[in-house]
Each structure stands twice: as C-alpha cells, then as structure tokens.
Curated annotation (Swiss-Prot):
The lineage of its organism: Bacteria, Bacillati, Chloroflexota, Chloroflexia, Chloroflexales. Pfam families: PRAI. The keyword Amino-acid biosynthesis applies. This is N-(5'-phosphoribosyl)anthranilate isomerase. Pathway: Amino-acid biosynthesis; L-tryptophan biosynthesis; L-tryptophan from chorismate: step 3/5. GO terms for molecular function: phosphoribosylanthranilate isomerase activity. InterPro entries: Aldolase_TIM (IPR013785), PRAI_dom (IPR001240), RibuloseP-bd_barrel (IPR011060), TrpF_fam (IPR044643). The gene is trpF.
C-alpha cells in the first residue's frame, strides 16, 4: 500500500510523514491555499530525503500541477529534484509521453469526458491514475469523498490511487472496499487548514493496518 501525504508546506510536517512511514509527499505548485514556492519545495524535498535515508528507505516526491505547461512542469521538477508529477487539471493525454520518464499521476473524477476516457485507457508503466471526487470548479483537496463504487470497479482492471475525503477514520473502509494501489490524503490530515502531526500518524497507521 502506497501512502501519499499531499499538500505539505512545512518541513516539520514532511518529517513527521517520513517518520510515520509515508511513501510519497505531495508538493502543490498550483494556485491554492496549499501552494508552495519552488525554493521551499526544494528545501523540504532535501530534508525529507535525508530523513528517509536515515531510516534506510526512500521517499518519493511528487509535484502537483493544474493545467501547467510541460516546460514549466519539467523546470520545477528539475529544480526540486521531483520523482514524479501529479496532473490534477484538464491536461491532455499527450502529457504522459512529454513528461516521461517522470512518474505521472493523473487525477480522474469520472466526468465521462473524452479527455478523461483517453487517460482511463492509456497504459504506460510510468503512468498511474488517481481517483478523486468530482467537485465543480475544484481541482482537489476539497475533502469530498470520491465515488468508491466506480473506483472499485476501475481498480479491478488496473492499479490506482484513491483520494477524495479520506481521513484516519474512513481510510480502512476505503481500502477494504476499493482495493487501491495507494491512498492520497490532504485535508483529512489537517486541523483548521494546517497539517496535523497526530492526524498524519493516525492516517498512516490506519492505512497500513488495513492493507495487511
């Protein structure tokens, strides 16, 4: 089970996630209240990698983008040493080839658009799907639960990450019902809009226990 803590903006929250056993950290470069500068992201990435190495493992750093150009995504990925990118907007499937060999995580929301259908049938080793909730005018981090029934149906055909309204309290049920490759959380480990150390630890522990 891959566990991704998304929307990390502070070094101490990143280190808590690493210490608790997170596999991925998401750094948001798209305009939002969780947006981070390239400089801060590079600093957090360096600290997280150092902490992970001290525990004999690795941490995967993912940059989150919304409708950004391929050139800008590549520039930021290079500057921060990102391992992969998450495309949370309306990016066309040609981005998959353009961003290789970076890991590409594409958010899908079952909006039944032609563009999303192209991603759903796209099959490349470096591309992973992330199922999120469909919220009009919102590109993620809204705390709304995704369609677990449709996610479970998709998970039977290909591996996926599950996002959308996950919390320490419901992640075990989500894993049992959907059987995803990974889970992604942002607002579910926050208190008053700020990452909460206790909730980060509780979420990771609950996800690990459910995946055993």
């Amino acid at each position: 089970m891959i566990i991704k803590i998304c929307g990390v903006r502070a070094r101490d929250h990143a280190l808590t996630a690493v210490d608790a056993g997170a596999d991925m950290l998401g750094l948001v470069f798209a305009p939002s209240r969780r947006q981070i500068t390239v400089e801060d992201a590079a600093s957090i990435a360096e600290a997280a990698r150092f902490a992970a190495r001290g525990r004999g493992r690795a941490i995967t750093l993912i940059g989150v983008f919304v409708n950004e150009t391929v050139e800008r995504i590549r520039d930021i990925a290079s500057s921060c040493g990102l391992d992969g990118v998450q495309l949370s907007g309306d990016e066309p499937v040609i981005y998959a080839d353009a961003l290789a060999p970076l890991l590409v995580i594409k958010a899908v929301r079952f909006d039944d658009s032609a563009q999303e259908r192209a991603w759903l049938i796209h099959d490349q080793a470096h591309v992973q799907l992330l199922v999120d909730a469909r919220v009009p005018g919102n590109y993620g981090g809204a705390g709304v639960v995704a369609d677990w029934e449709r996610a479970a149906e998709l998970a039977r055909r290909r591996s996926l990450m599950l996002a959308g309204g996950l919390t320490p309290e419901n992640v075990a049920d989500a894993i049992t019902r959907v059987r995803p490759w990974g889970v992604d959380v942002s607002s579910g480990v926050e208190s008053n809009g700020v990452k909460d150390h206790g909730k980060i630890r509780a979420f990771i522990a609950a996800a690990r226990a459910a995946a055993r």
